[in-house]
Amino acid sequence: MAPVGSRESLAAAIQAGADSIYFGIENLNMRSRSASAFTIDDLREIAGVCNDHGMKSYLTVNVIIYDNDMEQMRTIVRAAKEAGISAVIASDVSVMNFARSIGQEVHLSTQLNITNIESLKFYALFADVVVLARELN
């Protein structure tokens, strides 16, 4: 899995043989300030390129979602589903709930800091894949 934030880094991930990529768009992801040149209009192209190369595509929507973010979050997650993005990587329950309600696969972000079995059991109810906290080994 390779992080990508531009068409150039997507091409590099393909050339390096990555089997999947993750990326953010707009401002509802932890990478928004550092490495994302993609917009919602790029989702279909990204999904298509990944599909053409046998790769999975994961859209990060892994920030705290406030009431004023709900409409944008729904628009982004719905667009990801329609574009054929493999899954959304989420850390907020609102993203998990909405994505599941429209049939979009959900992967839970390490941002959730899941460090014990009870938390894992709980969050597994809402996700297809759970990424545990970085602190675990």
State where each predicted segment sits.
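N-terminal basic/disordered segments at the start of proteins
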Residues: M1-I21
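Active-site glycine- and acidic-residue-rich loops that bind
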Residues: M1-V4, V131-N137
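Aromatic/hydrophobic pocket-lining residues that form the small-molecule binding cavity
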Residues: S6, T39, L43, M73, ...
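A structural motif
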Residues: A18, I85, A127-D128
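Short hydrophobic/aromatic-enriched beta-strand-loop microsegments
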Residues: S20-G24, G103-N113, V129-L132
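Glycine-rich, proline-tolerant flexible connector loops at the mouths of alpha/beta enzymes
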Residues: Y22-L43, T60-D69
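N-terminal active-site wall of soluble small-molecule enzyme domains
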Residues: V49, M55-F122
